[in-house]
């Protein structure tokens, strides 16, 4: 089965929630993941979109969604949120995409040759910056 972070239903590969309103015990972190899962502009593995094919084995999201996800997790300020943030941005280094004006193929005539291209927003991958942990370390620990 897919890996879901303990205490959450939405953090990890896929989700374990039966409906949108359902959240795990780590509610705040789970809400960040749920919002990110519902990003309005994503590219599934091997999908061709915005003039680019996503050759990664996972979905990539528009950078606006990833930036919002990062801020959301950082505002939770607990260890679960940090673990999710570190896993996604620092360990897995999941890229996001931004749209830039460029030349994209609109008709490739079912061959490798592009027969018609035009100026359109074209996706460009952006590498993830490492996540900065936010949980306060307890004084007198470690």
Swiss-Prot record:
Protein EC: 3.1.1.4
Pfam families assigned to the protein according to its UniProt record, in alphabetical order: Phospholip_A2_2
Active site, renumbered: 36
InterPro entries the record matches: PLipase_A2_dom (IPR016090), PLipase_A2_dom_sf (IPR036444), PLipase_A2_His_AS (IPR033113)
Catalytic activity of the protein: a 1,2-diacyl-sn-glycero-3-phosphocholine + H2O = a 1-acyl-sn-glycero-3-phosphocholine + a fatty acid + H(+)
CDD domains: PLA2_bee_venom_like (cd04704)
Entry's Gene Ontology molecular function annotations: metal ion binding; phospholipase A2 activity
Disulfide cysteine pairs (residue numbers): 11-33, 32-72, 39-65
Subcellular localization, as worded in the UniProt entry: Secreted
Cofactors demanded by this protein: Ca(2+)
Protein keywords: Calcium, Disulfide bond, Hydrolase, Lipid degradation, Lipid metabolism, Metal-binding, Secreted
Enzyme class: hydrolase
Tissue distribution of the protein: Expressed by the venom gland.
Residues given in the record as Ca(2+) binding sites: 10, 12, 14, 37
Record's keyword annotation contains Hydrolase: yes
GO biological process: arachidonate secretion; lipid catabolic process; phospholipid metabolic process
Cofactor binding notes: Binds 1 Ca(2+) ion per subunit.
GO CC aspect terms: extracellular region
The family this protein is said to belong to: Belongs to the phospholipase A2 family. Group III subfamily.
Cited function: PLA2 catalyzes the calcium-dependent hydrolysis of the 2-acyl groups in 3-sn-phosphoglycerides.
Protein name: Acidic phospholipase A2 PA4
């Amino acid at each position: 089965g897919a890996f879901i972070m303990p205490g959450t239903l939405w953090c990890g590969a896929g989700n374990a929630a039966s409906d949108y309103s359902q959240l795990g015990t780590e509610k705040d972190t789970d809400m960040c993941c749920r919002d990110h899962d519902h990003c309005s502009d994503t590219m599934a593995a091997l999908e061709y979109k915005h003039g680019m094919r996503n050759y990664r084995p996972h979905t990539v999201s528009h950078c606006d969604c990833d930036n919002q996800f990062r801020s959301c997790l950082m505002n939770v300020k607990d260890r679960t949120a940090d673990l999710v943030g570190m896993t996604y941005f620092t360990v897995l280094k999941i890229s996001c995409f931004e749209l830039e004006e460029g030349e994209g193929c609109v008709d490739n005539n079912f061959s490798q040759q592009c027969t018609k291209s035009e100026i359109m927003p074209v996706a460009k991958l952006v590498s993830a910056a490492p996540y900065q942990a936010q949980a306060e370390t307890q004084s007198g620990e470690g």
